[in-house]
Amino acid sequence: MIGDIARILLVANATSLGWGLRGEWGHWWGATVPGALCGMSLWLAYGRSGYGWQMMAYGALLAVSLSVGGIMSYGLLVGYATAEKGRGERSPTYGCLALFLTGGLWGFFAGVGLGLLTTGTEYKAGDLAMWAVLASAGALMGYAILVRGLDLHLTPPRSDAWAAFLGAAVSTTIFFALWSKDLVVVANSALGWIGFGSGFSLGAVIHREGDRRGLGFSTWKFMEHNVGFFGGLALAVPAALHNGGPQSLDIGSSWKWAILLFQWFMFYMVITNNLDHWTADTKWLSRRIYAALQMGLILSLIPFIYLARPFVREWSGGGSSLVFVSLVFLLNIIGTAKFIHGWGDLRSRVVATFWIQFALVCLLLLLV
């Protein structure tokens, strides 16, 4: 019983920590972090131990699935939900419902990714190509009907990418429910929607009440952690109910290289975001130093590939928990460092939350 609870809480807290860190970097590149932590923790919780390549593959695929929602805009919706001054006449109820929509769309495609990993249905390249075409067509039609035709705008003058995502979600559901008759993918996508959507809405309500009562912590950051917690919780449920645990993937040499290059690229993106902030916002770095550091980061790919060659050939996948903890530790360091110039009581509490949750994830790993 304790182990079952610990497994679900491991996924929920790992995704929560990832989403809190995602707030440091933002956008789709930041969203690769909670996706990676969610996927890896799902394998550690429900997969077979000693299969580190499987863990990292799940992390990479969930990172891609979750990151696509990063092009949607939701900052103004939080302002509506919290009744922030200057946000127009749209009500907090509107803001919460709109956050359930955008957050749900974010989680929907994460659920699709997890569903494809755990379903018993075998999909060939042609099947996935058919889905990609239908999803793209749905995105175009959704945007054309809702935005161009009906003139619906969630957050004017911000992007209306939500309409394209909604169209893609509808066509994706039709494909998997009616064409493939794959209820595993449909159920996972629905749970992803509910988890991430409710996490956004509930987090916004807590954010509003925290600001109203003058609580001494970052209610915005609490909202971000809340999104990841409920999203991870929702995605952990089908994995917990799936007999035999997650499906093992056939991982050859090309897969291994793709996984490692993804890890390099994820770290490259978040470090670059730190450098952008230190150059454009704080003016710590000159443009020449920024360019030199960027060149160094890009050239680091050469020794990375050289050092990874024996790793690809010889690593059997053992010590997967240590690999996971090491990656989370490094991400925590990078996230902590970004706003080191603005250190104060509030920032101290934000950083403390990262490290307390990191410690909790490590403890839960020992219990699963």
PLM segments and residue spans:
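Alpha-helical transmembrane segments of secretory-pathway, organelle, and plasma-membrane proteins
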Residues: I2-V368
